[in-house]
């Protein structure tokens, strides 16, 4: 059985992630490298465990989380599909077809806002990925340059990110602290509305509700 540890040691996967980080850094994008994918993998596995998925499903969620952005080095556009195809090429002879298809599906759907959530693996990955907004994802250190891009501004403004799961209330909550001196809360919604809609859909698929709290104010 292939595990997350096996995936993390695979030279092809590591190179794809490194190249993707370099490609997006060239355009001053937020971090999509190892810090991001390791956090998403960890968050996905923890979420899967808390909502009661099997140990194998937990591992599939973690694997999908680690590999979800590795198609960016080919092209940012449709990177989710490139990532799924790359995963197939590397592991088609190493992972059972059912598990392989679930991971590929999750990778392919994670950044497609029009796609329907079709499995718990996909739902968990969406929630783990779209909830990762934080200052440390901003690669650029020059504040003047940061101010020129709304994605960098919003991520830089987030000083605290807490992802909470309450199985009893069946509620998943993203709690953020935002420096409103750097960016108004409304700018968060300018770029993250679609992502929050995705999170709500994903949570609903899991029979959970998704909540958003910013600066101790409940918005969802």
Language model segments and positions:
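Acidic/His-rich, divalent-metal-binding segments that scaffold phosphate/diphosphate chemistry
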Residues: 1-78
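Terminal helices and disordered tails flanking the catalytic cores of nucleotide-processing hydrolases
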Residues: 132-220
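Aromatic/hydrophobic pocket-lining residues that form π-stacking "cages" and hydrophobic walls in ligand
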Residues: 44, 124, 199
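Divalent metal-dependent catalytic cores for phosphoryl transfer on phosphate-bearing substrates
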Residues: 26, 49-165
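Alpha-helical structural motif
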Residues: 9-12, 16, 99, 120, ...
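Charged/polar, solvent-exposed surface patches and flexible loops
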Residues: 15-22, 89, 105, 109, ...
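Non-transmembrane, amphipathic alpha-helical segments
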Residues: 29-32, 116, 187, 191
């Amino acid at each position: 059985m292939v595990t997350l540890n096996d995936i993390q040691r695979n030279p092809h996967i590591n190179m794809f992630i490194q190249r993707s980080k370099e490609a997006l850094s060239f355009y001053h994008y937020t971090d999509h490298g190892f810090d991001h994918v390791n956090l998403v993998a960890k968050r996905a596995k923890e979420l899967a465990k808390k909502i009661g998925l099997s140990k194998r499903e937990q591992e599939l969620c973690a694997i999908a989380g680690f590999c979800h952005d590795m198609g960016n080095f080919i092209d940012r556009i449709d990177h989710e599909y490139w990532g799924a195809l790359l995963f197939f090429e590397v592991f088609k002879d190493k992972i059972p077809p059912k598990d392989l298809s679930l991971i590929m599906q999750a990778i392919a759907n994670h950044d497609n806002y029009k796609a329907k959530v079709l499995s718990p693996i996909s739902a968990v990955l969406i929630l783990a990925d779209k909830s990762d907004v934080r200052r440390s994802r901003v690669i650029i250190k020059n504040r003047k340059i940061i101010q020129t891009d709304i994605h960098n501004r919003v991520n830089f403004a987030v000083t605290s990110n807490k992802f909470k799961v309450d199985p009893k209330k069946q509620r998943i909550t993203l709690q953020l602290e935002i420096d409103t001196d750097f960016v108004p809360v409304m700018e968060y919604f300018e770029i993250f509305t679609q992502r929050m809609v995705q999170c709500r859909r994903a949570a609903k698929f899991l029979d959970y509700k998704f909540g958003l709290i910013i600066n101790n104010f409940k918005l969802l």
